[in-house]
UniProtKB/Swiss-Prot annotation:
GO biological process, one term: carbohydrate metabolic process
Active site: E206 (proton donor), E387 (nucleophile)
Source species, domain of life: Archaea
Keywords carried by this UniProt record: Glycosidase, Hydrolase, Methylation
Gene designation: bglY
Protein's name in the database: Beta-galactosidase
Annotated PROSITE patterns: GLYCOSYL_HYDROL_F1_1, GLYCOSYL_HYDROL_F1_2
Residue numbers of N6-methyllysine PTMs: K135, K273, K332
Enzyme class: hydrolase
Catalyzed chemical reaction(s): Hydrolysis of terminal non-reducing beta-D-galactose residues in beta-D-galactosides
Pfam families hit by this protein: Glyco_hydro_1
Coiled coil: none
């Protein structure tokens, strides 16, 4: 048996926009994402699926059923978020000392008077309902990580359709320092309201996806779908500042640890000659971001500067991992290659002969070990695996995927990395952003018509892991690449 440390926790992660809607009264129409997926032009262009989040799994109304299933599975940790737009659906008065002419936001004033002013504008019904959800979670002995931001912005801060059409007069989301100020205030306010129920905080989930797919990978179907490398860099600059100011804001009302959750790929060289390409890819896609919020090092234009107001703004790292990226060195640097990682055909095999998921993502568990150990060796901050899972409606690969990736976490811990939990993505099927309901990541299968939850076989495998604190001898045989099925005709 592969046993984990006694204090290690197995659990799950989920997001509000993807899971909450689906029961009467659960709709949240006041976000950029809601407007984006309902936009007729986006739907007709195939940028989004046409599936609508208000038909989702219904966690807002049925959270106790979700928690019942998690408890039966033996899960002991959960990462959830508060939807910003539910708490502040309407535009707030501008923050004190706000100056939109300044590129650098080095401080956002947070005090008791400011928090009380925010409280006057907050949606009390939403606050009370979130408290009911979190209290129910805690009553079951589940350790709780509260994440502040999992992609949707309030419409009063970001109108993605206007930006997509080239209107940058506002509201422009992460292109504006106003969003930096507001996120700091929101994060401090949420910590002020819920600190008695929270064990640890995360400021954001996968900020690199927001800054990348919204402005560079515009065919991904992510808002605002405005192609501009310059604006992508501007958005990431503001996101880094927003994390640091939110960290300060939360610390002003709480002593709990604060992390950030990041989308990771394991960069692998095509040949031995491409090791330098891996180093460049890791810096561009990972270390540049974390060097900013840990060491204070950030690029301003073409110049690297050190900002003390960014330094040391992180207590732990949330590692999201699904697959790898194979890179090759070029004259100008490096390039990522199709046929591996995220760039494969769906339900097929990669160029390496490895099976791929319903999403076309390659089965590559050893990449999780690579990511965890490299984070540990560079920063020595403790970690959680905050997302790991597979789109697999048939649940054929998921049992293998689950055991193989949990094993790689065990390897990383044995190599000295401080990893304190594994949170699977996800407990139940949900709304997979631009792909709608077609991509099913759940241990529990959702019947979207009845909102009933059904246990997939992989849920039984995860229960075996969670209740025994590791990979037992009975399921160790799943620590391998799943046998590849014949191609369907």
């Amino acid at each position: 048996m592969y046993s984990f440390p006694k204090n290690f926790r197995f659990g799950w992660s989920q997001a509000g926009f993807q899971s909450e809607m689906g029961t009467p009264g659960s709709e949240d129409p006041n976000t950029d994402w809601y407007k984006w997926v309902h936009d007729p032009e986006n739907i007709s262009a195939g940028l989004v699926s046409g599936d609508l989040p208000e038909n989702g799994p219904g966690y807002w109304g049925n959270y106790k059923t979700f928690h019942d299933n998690a408890q039966k599975m033996g899960l002991k940790i959960a990462r959830l978020n508060v939807e910003w737009s539910r708490i502040f659906p309407n535009q707030l008065p501008k923050p004190q000392n706000f100056d939109d002419s300044k590129q650098d936001v080095t401080e956002v004033e947070i005090n008791q008077n400011e928090l009380r002013r925010l409280d006057e504008h907050a949606n009390k019904d939403a606050l009370n309902h979130y408290r009911e959800i979190f209290k129910d979670l805690k009553s079951r002995g589940i350790y709780f990580i509260l994440n502040m931001y999992h992609w949707p912005l309030p419409l009063w801060l970001h109108d993605p359709i206007r930006v997509r059409r080239g209107d940058l007069s506002g509201p422009t989301g992460w292109l504006s320092t106003r969003t930096v100020y507001e996120f700091a205030r929101f994060s401090a306010y949420i910590a002020w309201k819920f600190d008695d129920l929270v064990d640890e905080y995360s400021t954001m989930n996968e900020p690199n996806v927001v800054g990348g797919l919204g402005y560079v990978g515009v065919k991904s179907g992510f808002p605002p779908g405005y192609l501009s490398f310059e604006l992508s860099r501007k958005a990431m600059y503001n996101i880094i500042q927003a994390h640091a100011r939110a960290y300060d804001g939360i610390k002003s009302v709480s002593k709990k640890p604060i992390g950030i959750i990041y989308a990771n790929s394991s960069f692998q060289p095509l040949t031995e000659k491409d090791v330098e390409a891996v180093e460049m890819a890791e810096y561009d896609n990972r270390w540049a971001f974390f060097d900013a919020i840990i060491r204070g090092e950030i690029m301003r234009g073409s110049e690297k500067v050190v900002r003390d107001d960014l330094r040391g703004r992180l207590d732990w790292i949330g590692v999201n991992y699904y697959t790898r990226t194979v890179v090759k060195k070029t004259e100008k640097g490096y390039t990522s290659l199709g046929g591996y990682g995220h760039g494969c055909e769906r339900n097929s095999v990669s160029l390496a002969g490895l099976p791929t998921s319903d999403f076309g993502w390659e089965f590559f568990p050893e990449g999780l070990y690579d990511v965890l150990t490299k984070y540990w060796n560079r920063y020595h901050l403790y970690m959680y695996v905050t997302e790991n899972g597979i789109a697999d409606d048939a649940d054929y690969q998921r049992p293998y995927y689950l055991v193989s990736h949990v094993y790689q976490v065990h390897r990383a811990i044995n190599s000295g990395a401080d990893v304190r939990g594994y949170l699977h993505w996800s407990l139940a099927d949900n709304y997979e952003w631009a792909s709608g309901f077609s991509m099913r990541f759940g241990l529990l299968k959702v019947d979207y018509g009845t909102k009933r939850l059904y246990w997939r076989p992989s849920a039984l495998v995860y229960r075996e892991i969670a209740t025994n604190g590791g990979i037992t001898d009975e399921i160790e045989h799943l620590n391998t690449v799943p046998p590849i099925r014949p191609l369907r005709h």
